[in-house]
Amino acid sequence: MAMAMDRIVFSPSSYVYRPCQARGSRSSRVSMASTIRSATTEVTNGRKLYIPPREVHVQVKHSMPPQKLEIFKSLEGWADETLLTYLKPVEKSWQPTDFLPEPESEGFYDQVKELRERCKELPDDYFVVLVGDMITEEALPTYQTMLNTLDGVRDETGASPTPWAIWTRAWTAEENRHGDLLNKYLYLSGRVDMRQIEKTIQYLIGSGMDPKTENNPYLGFIYTSFQERATFISHGNTARLAKDRGDLKLAQICGTIAADERRHETAYTKIVEKLFEIDPDGTILGLADMMKKKISMPAHLMYDGQDDNLFEHFSTVAQRLGVYTAKDYADILEFLVERWNVETLTDLSSEGHRAQDFVCGLPARIRKIEERAQGRAKEAAKNIPFSWIFGRNIRA
């Protein structure tokens, strides 16, 4: 559906993007996606059964000018020599069984008993955050699908030999271990309702994600740079909390996953660094565009069949525990601005200079807004039941 628009207004829901002005350079190819679900209305239409609990929004497609496809073709040699070095050979990689009780061992039951004893020291709110992180990792099919929507770098055949396609498949293979490991650990812990968790994973993969990357690899790689650092921080903090509570094995697990995320973050930031080198104006415009729309978390369409605001509630608990906070969001942006030398960019268009000023000033603005929001959040705190922990209430 093609349509002209000066401004798109979205729902005021906490995790729906704020209004942003459509630029003239954008493709006119957009599609409307209705994402409304009522928890109390039984829906018989098969398609509607899988629509996530979000408001109507507009999806922009293929916003990158076709002439810029050549940039990514020309970078294949660089990707082969630089990007792929951030992958680890399978034979040198850790596997989930390295951290779990050994089922073939005579001591298996004792090992499981020890694991469950350690987990007794961990509070319910910690498990809510750990489960949310695990569910996010388990939706990996969606993330590989997202990368393969990006023009110029997608895997065109499913087994393409281009370095971009090799990276996507191998990155996915490395990430696949994260959800596997956390899932098995949580299953053995006996502290969580695995059926509700499994339902949430199925709902989430079926719902997909809406990162607003528009098939545009500039936007896509900016998004992944931000997200990999966010997951590095989140897993690092769950490791710290597990250590504080005496579960050193779980701390090791979360720390190992965090190390993978840090390596992947470095790879994606290298791509964007290269884009800034080749096309500073186009890249700064892409960065400003993504920040105006706000970076959504990859599991923002999370649903368990009961709570239409599940992701918001999970995020609130993560914020309260200090696992992933609005301060982290601002810190990540500030880190990337410094990493990519955004403040010192030259040879920009007037629009590029405005984008540069916006991005460089944004971390301070986010922090000011967050300070005010924290006061309101404390006043509005309430108990929220989480199906993942058998319906027990958590302060959020």
Curated annotation (Swiss-Prot):
Q: Which residues are listed for Fe cation 2 binding in this entry?
A: E175, E228, E261, H264
By its UniProt entry, which Pfam families does this protein fall under?
A: FA_desaturase_2 (PF03405)
Q: Which reaction does it catalyse?
A: octadecanoyl-[ACP] + 2 reduced [2Fe-2S]-[ferredoxin] + O2 + 2 H(+) = (9Z)-octadecenoyl-[ACP] + 2 oxidized [2Fe-2S]-[ferredoxin] + 2 H2O
Q: How is the cofactor bound?
A: Binds 2 Fe(2+) ions per subunit.
**What causes induction of this gene?**
Positively regulated by LEC1.
Q: Where is the transit peptide?
A: 1-29
Q: Write one Gene Ontology MF term.
A: stearoyl-[ACP] desaturase activity
The residues that the entry says bind Fe cation 1 are: E137, E175, H178, E261
Q: In which pathway does it act?
A: Lipid metabolism; fatty acid metabolism
**Any idea of its EC number?**
1.14.19.2
Transmembrane helix recorded as keyword: no
- GO CC, one annotated term: chloroplast
Tell me its family: Belongs to the fatty acid desaturase type 2 family.
UniProt subunit comment: Homodimer.
Record function comment: Converts stearoyl-ACP to oleoyl-ACP by introduction of a cis double bond between carbons 9 and 10 of the acyl chain.
Question: What protein name is recorded for this chain?
Answer: Stearoyl-[acyl-carrier-protein] 9-desaturase 5, chloroplastic
Supply the gene name.
S-ACP-DES5
